[in-house]
Amino acid sequence: MTHLHAGLNPETIEKGRLELNENPDTLHQDIQQVRDMIITRPDIGFLRTDDAFILRFLRARKFNQMEAFRLLAQYFQYRQLNLDMFKNLKADDPGIKRALMDGFPGVLENRDHYGRKILLLFAANWDQSRNSFVDILRAILLSLEVLIEDQELQINGFILIIDWSNFSFKQASKLTPSILRLAIEGLQDSFPARFGGVHFVNQPWYIHALYTIIKPFLKDKTRKRIFLHGNNLNSLHQLIHPDCLPSEFGGTLPPYDMGTWARTLLGPDYNDENEYTHSSYNVIHVKHVPAIVEGEDSPKYMKRSHSVVEPGTLRHEEERENENTQPLLALD
């Protein structure tokens, strides 16, 4: 077993072989083939090219070297084109800290039965006077950077559940084509994570409308992994066992504590929102997340809200500003 597999259990190594075409005997050769392609993109600054880093891109693209390199190039190109987003991508950045403390994103301690990490977004918590959409996106990207250091998650992947309960039409009207495209480029096109599913629950009609509008920007593979459950959670439980879910989603775990992930990343900074030190989390150091204690069963239904690379693949920030910045949904 190569040192790059250190810490992986035999079952996960076998899963990597069967599902991702990962071969321990040719691992270093596969990595070097991707590294050798870097010279073909002198327009991009590849700031990290070590074996462990390149390996996560190979896993994200099932060891197709060309696709892995394209993803690697888009990862750094996205950061070059959006320098302000990544200038201080740390948990103690004021904007990121506010987003984390408001639960963007939530991260469950328990994984699902396939070993996937479960991320939560409670959309109605978006206070637009407090958090910009970009800062929420930055907090999500930082969280993914932290989590993807875990080799088990590089192979098993992630699940995202978005609860749209009480997400108002007014909030939805603030979502513009440019910021939605920024999120799609950052999460779908430029990050080495395997997303096994994106689950919408309690989505109102205007989220269906938003999803229809952004569908053309989604890859076919992404579209097939988006599930619209509405307010009946039986279909969600067919894909994610209730034992892995908090009570908000009809699961057997206690209600999700919005501060769990923020406390993990911020450490002693969590309780003081006005002081920002350099002792908090960054993308290099990984801390252990405290375990969550199981609770009692909860109902199966939730109330519906009354109130979704080649050069030039990614756009420069100034180009986005020149795009249509009108909301996708307009208030009367």
From Swiss-Prot:
Write out the ranges of the annotated region (Disordered).
Answer: 300-332
Fetch the SMART domains from UniProt. CRAL_TRIO_N, SEC14
| PROSITE patterns per UniProt | CRAL_TRIO
**Topological relation to the membrane, as annotated:** Peripheral membrane protein
Where's it mainly located? Answer: Golgi
| A single GO cellular-component term on record | endosome
Q: Report domain CRAL-TRIO positions.
A: 96-257
Which superkingdom? Answer: Eukaryota
Q: Some GO term, biological process aspect, for this entry: which one?
A: lysosome organization
Which SUPFAM superfamilies does this chain map to?
Answer: CRAL/TRIO domain, CRAL/TRIO N-terminal domain
Record-linked InterPro entries: CRAL-TRIO_dom, CRAL-TRIO_dom_sf, CRAL/TRIO_N_dom, CRAL/TRIO_N_dom_sf
Cellular location of this protein? Golgi apparatus, trans-Golgi network membrane; Early endosome membrane; Cytoplasmic vesicle, Clathrin-coated vesicle
Q: Which UniProt keywords apply?
A: Cytoplasmic vesicle, Endosome, Golgi apparatus, Lipid-binding, Membrane
Q: Under the GO molecular function aspect, what terms does this record hold?
A: phosphatidylinositol bisphosphate binding; phosphatidylinositol-3,5-bisphosphate binding
| Biased composition annotated in UniProt, kind: Basic and acidic residues | 313-323
> Any extra remark in the record?
Binding to PtdIns(3,5)P2 is not required for localization.
Its domain comment says: The CRAL-TRIO domain is required for targeting to the membrane and for binding PtdIns(3,5)P2.
The protein's job, in short, is:
Required for normal morphology of late endosomes and/or lysosomes in neurons. Binds phosphatidylinositol 3,5-bisphosphate (PtdIns(3,5)P2).
Query: How is this protein named in the record?
Result: Clavesin-1
Source organism: Xenopus laevis
